[in-house]
Design a protein with these regions (language model features):
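N-terminal Rossmann-like NAD(P) cofactor-binding subdomain of oxidoreductases
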Residues: 1-154
Length: 154
């Protein structure tokens, strides 16, 4: 069964996370970014470092369409108002760089997500993990807000 993920912030890190999840058993069920979907589609499709996205990418007024799959896009500035529950997002990748404090990241949980992965150093997460260093320390029973240490570390 695929894990359902939402992405808050579809800038460089959000798009790279999307690319990394595209060929895994992970389903991106929603994206939140203040930029209109047409521009997000262009940025996903054409990457000057990693090359073009290996699939089809287009946009509707409120969604990206990637390889024929429609992914809703919202433009909420308040994470508590992003429809994660409605979209079925169990995990949210927080990649805006704005919601790195626990109190701010908790808004994603209030909106229906079960877990938040912060792509930047966080002030007070449940745990900070670096893949290959301490990722075995992850405890799903008590770690709901996880810091990825730094988007340039992993």
């Amino acid at each position: 069964m695929a894990v359902s993920v939402g992405i808050n912030g579809f800038g460089r890190i959000g798009r790279l996370a999307f690319r990394a999840m595209a060929d895994k058993d992970i389903q991106v069920v929603g994206i939140n970014d203040i930029v209109e979907p047409k521009i997000l589609a262009h940025l996903l499709k054409w990457d000057s470092v990693h090359g073009p996205f290996p699939g089809t990418v287009s946009a509707d007024t409120d969604a990206l369409v990637v390889n024929g799959k429609r992914i809703p896009v919202s433009a909420e500035r308040d994470p508590a108002k992003i429809p994660w529950k409605q979209w079925g997002a169990r995990i949210v990748v927080e990649s805006t760089g704005l919601f790195t404090a626990r109190e701010k990241a908790k808004a994603h949980l209030a909106a229906g997500a079960e877990r938040v992965i912060i792509s930047a150093p966080a002030e007070d997460p449940d745990v900070t993990l670096v893949l290959g260093v301490n990722d075995a320390a992850y405890d799903p029973a008590k770690h709901f807000i996880v810091s990825n240490a730094s988007c340039t570390t992993n």
